[in-house]
């Protein structure tokens, strides 16, 4: 008998976003290549995530729900009206345009973005209304790079941040912890809550730094928040090549203690499978087992602090097949499924965690000195 289930929120309209072809994510055709590649954030990656949840071994543990599109008033919980107007006007033009580096809006993109935001809001509302405790918003385009005033990194609207705002505005949540395991810094979410002590944002990412005007944040350990939010933005830049043991060490030594000190009543896990060993858009070495352990740890965090309430929001993950396998493994961990139902098809990358452990210990020392609410841990 299945007693442990995840409520998955999805809408087919999100497949209509077409992020162009070219050289990787540039949309550029140099004229001398016979075969161009799809943009890494293409619909195929999400189709496989969808199908593995529908037809894979985990399918009996999944309840399906259809998300609703967000409306403008909901978007204004996080984004400025000027920015939303810019997106609306770009959509009205009916032409393909590059909103930010590598971030293309085409006919159908705005509809998909509204569905991604609204589907995530639907999932959070589902939890707030006590219809379920564990929900996963399977959405695209992704959102965690989108800032209140601008697009960035394939992201138009910050889906997870909007869900956090909804939770805080509901009256039933006063403190939300957001844990981001995408391989890239969740700069948009961090930016939106940078002066808040109601939201703890923790981002585990490769140490990539800033990548231009749309992404001025570095994701470094000294970006701690400002004013009353000082100390509530914790960055964990991990060395390239960090794998399962390194991520588990960071989760247990940095993330879990910080969340325990913060004491949230809602937990949001921002998920990217681009931290896997084979992702074209990252340089880390997580395998299915690593994602499974993260799922187990996050389930424990939710049970300890938020009465088991856990919202998961999909972000990156660009290996068209392996990202789906990693999602399956993570949800197995969240659902406490005792043994893996799928063997890992390609995980053979050797891991040396010494560099990751050294980085985590250095970050821990920094936090105890400069983060007020973590002093004494």
Curated annotation (Swiss-Prot):
Its function?
Responsible for the deacetylation of lysine residues on the N-terminal part of the core histones (H2A, H2B, H3 and H4). Histone deacetylation gives a tag for epigenetic repression and plays an important role in transcriptional regulation, cell cycle progression and developmental events. Histone deacetylases act via the formation of large multiprotein complexes.
| Active site, renumbered | 145
One GO term under biological process is:
chromatin organization
> SUPFAM superfamilies from the entry?
Arginase/deacetylase
Q: Which GO terms describe its cellular component?
A: cytoplasm; nucleus
Which chemical reaction does it catalyze?
Answer: N(6)-acetyl-L-lysyl-[histone] + H2O = L-lysyl-[histone] + acetate
Name the predominant localization. nucleus
> What is the free-text note on the cofactor?
Binds 1 zinc ion per subunit.
Gene3D superfamilies associated with the record: Histone deacetylase domain (3.40.800.20)
What InterPro entries does UniProt report for this protein, alphabetically?
Answer: HDAC_PDAC, His_deacetylse, His_deacetylse_dom, His_deacetylse_dom_sf, Ureohydrolase_dom_sf
- The protein's required cofactors: Zn(2+)
User: Can you provide one Gene Ontology molecular function annotated for this UniProt record?
Assistant: histone deacetylase activity, hydrolytic mechanism
Q: In which tissues is it expressed?
A: Expressed in stems, leaves, flowers, siliques and mature seeds.
- Which species? Arabidopsis thaliana
Family according to the record: Belongs to the histone deacetylase family.
Protein name, as recorded: Histone deacetylase 8
**UniProt-annotated stretches for the region Histone deacetylase:** 5-336
Q: Which sites bind Zn(2+)?
A: 182, 184, 274
Query: Does the entry feature the keyword Transport, yes or no?
Result: no
A family per Pfam? Hist_deacetyl
The EC number(s) this enzyme carries: 3.5.1.98
Q: Which residue numbers mark the site Polarizes the scissile carbonyl of the substrate?
A: 318
Where does this protein reside within or beyond the cell?
A: Nucleus; Cytoplasm
What UniProt keywords are attached to this protein's entry?
Answer: Chromatin regulator, Cytoplasm, Hydrolase, Metal-binding, Nucleus, Repressor, Transcription, Transcription regulation, Zinc
Kindly indicate whether the keyword Membrane belongs to this entry.
Answer: no
């Amino acid at each position: 008998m299945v007693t442990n289930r995840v409520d998955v929120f999805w809408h087919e309209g999100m497949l209509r976003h077409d992020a162009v072809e070219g050289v990787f994510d540039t949309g550029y055709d140099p004229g001398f290549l016979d075969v161009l590649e799809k943009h890494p954030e293409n619909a195929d990656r999400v189709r496989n995530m969808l199908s593995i949840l529908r037809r894979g071994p985990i399918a009996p543990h999944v309840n399906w729900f259809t998300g609703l599109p967000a409306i403008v008033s909901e978007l204004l919980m996080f984004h400025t009206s000027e920015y939303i107007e810019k997106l609306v006007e770009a959509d009205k033009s009916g032409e393909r345009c590059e909103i930010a580096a590598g971030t293309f809006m085409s006919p159908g993109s705005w509809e998909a973005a509204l569905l991604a935001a609204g589907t995530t809001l639907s999932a959070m509302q589902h939890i707030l209304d006590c219809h379920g405790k564990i929900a996963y918003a399977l959405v695209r385009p992704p959102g965690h790079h989108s800032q209140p005033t601008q697009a960035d990194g394939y992201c138009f609207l910050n889906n997870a941040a909007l869900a956090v705002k909804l939770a805080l505005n509901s009256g039933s949540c006063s403190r939300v912890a957001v844990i981001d395991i995408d391989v890239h810094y969740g700069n948009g979410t961090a930016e939106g809550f940078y002066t808040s002590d109601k939201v703890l944002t923790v981002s585990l990412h490769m140490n990539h730094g800033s990548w231009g005007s749309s992404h001025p944040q570095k994701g470094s350990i000294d970006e701690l928040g400002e004013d009353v939010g000082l100390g509530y933005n914790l960055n964990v830049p991990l060395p390239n090549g960090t794998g399962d043991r390194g991520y588990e060490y960071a989760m247990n030594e940095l993330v879990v203690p910080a969340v325990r000190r913060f004491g949230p009543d809602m937990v949001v896990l921002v998920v990217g499978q681009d931290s896997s060993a084979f992702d074209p858009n990252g340089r880390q070495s997580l395998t299915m087992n690593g994602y499974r352990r993260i799922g187990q740890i996050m389930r424990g965090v939710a049970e300890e602090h938020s009465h088991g309430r856990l919202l998961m929001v999909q972000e990156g993950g660009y290996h068209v097949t392996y990202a789906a396998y990693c999602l399956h493994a993570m949800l197995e961990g969240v659902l406490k499924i005792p043994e893996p139902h799928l063997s890992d098809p390609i995980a053979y990358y050797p891991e040396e965690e010494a560099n990751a452990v050294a980085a985590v210990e250095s970050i821990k020392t920094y936090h105890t000195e400069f983060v007020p609410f973590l002093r004494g841990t």
